Swiss-Prot record:
Its cofactor is pyruvate. This is Pyruvoyl-dependent arginine decarboxylase AaxB. Thermostable. Retains 48% activity at 50 degrees Celsius, and 13% activity at 100 degrees Celsius. Belongs to the pyruvoyl-dependent arginine decarboxylase family. Optimum pH is 3.4. Keywords: Cytoplasm, Decarboxylase, Lyase, Pyruvate, Virulence. Its main location: cytoplasm. Binds 1 pyruvoyl group covalently per subunit. Part of the AaxABC system, catalyzes the decarboxylation of L-arginine. The arginine uptake by the bacterium in the macrophage may be a virulence factor against the host innate immune response.
Amino acid sequence: MAYGTRYPTLAFHTGGIGESDDGMPPQPFETFCYDSALLQAKIENFNIVPYTSVLPKELFGNIVPVDTCVKSFKHGAVLEVIMAGRGAALSDGTHAIATGIGICWGKDKNGELIGGWAAEYVEFFPTWINDEIAETHAKMWLKKSLQHELDLRSIAKHSEFQFFHNYINIKQKFGFCLTALGFLNFENAEPAKVN
């Protein structure tokens, strides 16, 4: 029996940071720091598969904090995510990393919700920062990116943009910061018909 393409109907937002004085080349921050960031984000026991940025309209109003659904997580399952995540070495002059994800929703000419798009933000800082700086920078760059996504498609904004951010001030040799959307529940579109 044929079935159509799969799309998510429930998502969660999360974030995490990690740092370490140890790591393996060529990207030492990808080893222990990344694992620590996944642990803090509560997604360390998933097999992570990255998504691009298109969100079905069924996710509108169905993006929840990670703590509301963590009890449903299955060890070893595949988790499809949109992730803004990067690592850095203190020796390269990076002392802080900020990450974020923004979401916009578009509407058609009748005002009906079409669906949404996400944008990712990563920025390196030569000094330590605070949450206000991380949030301000994330919103500034994500607003620009989200508006571009709407303008490129000639689609009007349906509702207010949504933003999630995270940051780390690196105190050890290596650091990693991530902000992510994870997708849990799915449905299938109608099977395609070819004329």
